[in-house]
Amino acid sequence: MLKIAVDAMGGDFAPEVNILGAYEVVQDIEVEIILVGDEKKIKSFLPEKKETKGIISVIPADDVIQMDENISSALRRKNTSMRKAVELVKAGKADAVISAGHSGAMMALSFLLLGKLPNVERPAIATVMPCLKGHFILLDAGANVDCKPEHLVQFAFMGEAYHKALFNSQSPKIALLSIGEEGSKGNELTKEAFKLLKSSRLNFVGNIEGKDIFFGQADVVVCDGFVGNIVLKVGEGLAEALMKMLKREIADIITGKLGYMMIKPAIKSFRKKVDYSEYGGALLLGINGTSIICHGRSSAKAIKNAIKVATEMVKKQIYTRISESLNQTEERDESQNSVNRLLCS
């Protein structure tokens, strides 16, 4: 049975939503959820015991990393719920870790305790986003605000491996987010990254503009973490605003209530597609383990779905796939360099 460590104290609505999300999961699938945090509070929120497919255990931790806390001070404390949850993966006592707490601290702890995969220069946050054709993966969504062209290329390879594992795709289309479709447009980072991606083995379809990413023209959209996080937050805010505007417009017309009843199924379907809680959390790629960062205001449903994503990624050995993909790329590059040296000698 897989074991998933959950930082029970992380997030705006902790520990209740983390505990309820875990409880909902063990009713559906065979998995052990290890809740890490204030034991007394955790047990007070656990529903009465009944027969479930999975099990829930508790590991006490008497310290919590606050959402507005300085990362360096958070890392120095050894008994936080987040740190102890990540340490379970490091010790082999859990197969994956999930937290809706301080995202910067979660990234740093995952990086420091679990380490990077071989040949990975920078881990990246990969998030699944909705589009007209289903879903696409955006990375980096906030781990690295300053990048080199080579980092974006690695993000692309990691994103490809993630897409293949998540959606069973064969050759996902990779695009570089920029201000124009032409390779000559953008800043120095994107122009150089365009050249490198074009010469790679990836199914690189070129640059993609911000207005096109939600139309499904690419399966994986690559950018630095500064741009990616803005795209993510704009997408979330726009979806919420559109839902509110639609409800207001319906309420303002005489036949609003009747009209709403007629289109209610469509609105419900749309809300589900753009609701971040449906996707659980964002996977930290490039780490030697499965680490998922959830939204700070995650609901019980978001935590439940994040746990399910974690179990799927462990079963599909996502970090092994990423490592193999990058190793193959490294071998090709070394082989090509050897050929070039021979030609020049």
Swiss-Prot record:
Disulphide bridges: none
Any single GO CC term annotated in Swiss-Prot or TrEMBL for this entry: cytoplasm
Mind listing the GO molecular function terms for this protein?
phosphate:acyl-[acyl carrier protein] acyltransferase activity
Recorded hits in Gene3D superfamilies, A to Z, give:
Isopropylmalate Dehydrogenase
Its Gene Ontology biological processes? Answer: fatty acid biosynthetic process; phospholipid biosynthetic process
Alphabetical list of InterPro entries matching this protein: FA_synthesis (IPR003664), Phospholipid_synth_PlsX-like (IPR012281)
Can you tell me where the transmembrane regions are?
Answer: none
Can you name the source organism? Thermodesulfovibrio yellowstonii (strain ATCC 51303 / DSM 11347 / YP87)
Q: Which EC number applies?
A: 2.3.1.274
Protein name according to UniProt: Phosphate acyltransferase
Q: What's this protein's family per the entry?
A: Belongs to the PlsX family.
The protein's assembly and partners: Homodimer. Probably interacts with PlsY.
Q: What does this protein do?
A: Catalyzes the reversible formation of acyl-phosphate (acyl-PO(4)) from acyl-[acyl-carrier-protein] (acyl-ACP). This enzyme utilizes acyl-ACP as fatty acyl donor, but not acyl-CoA.
- Provide this UniProt record's keywords sorted from A to Z: Cytoplasm, Lipid biosynthesis, Lipid metabolism, Phospholipid biosynthesis, Phospholipid metabolism, Transferase
State the reactions this protein catalyses.
a fatty acyl-[ACP] + phosphate = an acyl phosphate + holo-[ACP]
Pfam families cross-referenced by the UniProt entry: FA_synthesis
Functional pathway: Lipid metabolism; phospholipid metabolism
Localization, per the record, is:
Cytoplasm
